[in-house]
Amino acid sequence: MSGPAQATGAAPWRPALVLISVEELLATEFPPREMVLSPWLPSKGLAMIYGRRGLGKTHVALGIAWAVATGGSFLRWTAPRQRRVVILDGEMPGEALKARLAEISAKAGVAVPEGFIRLAAADLQERSINLAEEADQRELEPHLAGADLVIVDNISTLAAYGRENEAESWLPVQTWALGQRRAGRTVLFLHHAGKGGAQRGTSRREDVLDTVIALREPPDYQQAEGARFAVHFEKARGFHGKAAEPFEAALGEAGWVMRDAVDAEVERVMALRAEGLSVREVAEELGVARSRVERAIKRGAEPGSQ
């Protein structure tokens, strides 16, 4: 931060605090807040996607990056126009990152404009990036110039500061993220889920976020399936209804296949019932309440549901 010269031992220069009246605020013309990826990722927004290791978080992050850079779509979300993206990857080997982007490129059918996606891949760095360190924040800043979306993959590898479950450990990264928002950028964090299924570490991360998405394993998920998950919006600021309802996504040979989470559950329940399982046995198999199984059976019996 530059500023007026300071005498030796004086406090570092800081911008003056600005207060305005309600009348001034109401008279202020703010530019409309656009969507980077509709309906859940706004411009100057802060969001997080978390899930178990190996479930498909990086697949999702790269798919989002490609959609935003090309003005395209990914899963059930749409980018209204092309925007520049910077991906900070702290975990994936370079060859794996290259392979996944090549796969996305082949299936997308549209190329990213030159320079619209730039990456800081872990394998290409001589040292790790740590967003909790002010020196690394300052070094990174020139590389973010012109970017609209910054994807941080992931918090555990790129924001190491103290103990992960302590709220204070998040504060330096939160300060950096809020600075990005003031600069007009959107930040999307990726994070791991803990053993209980919730995001790992302090829940204080969610305080300043617009959107929190959990990627969860469907009840019948098998490890060999790879990228297949249920998308759940745990925090949805500014949108609701159908746009915020959970759905399932699976990556196949031809690309991503989606279906409503309710329909997927009905299908699983009816399949188990067809195998002769009782309501109690189905509930135990899927790890849900009997009342939920009964509702699914009722829905599955409706005309046109199967």
Outline where the language-model segments fall.
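Hydrophobic positions on the alpha1 helix immediately C-terminal to the Walker A/P-loop
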Residues: V60, I64
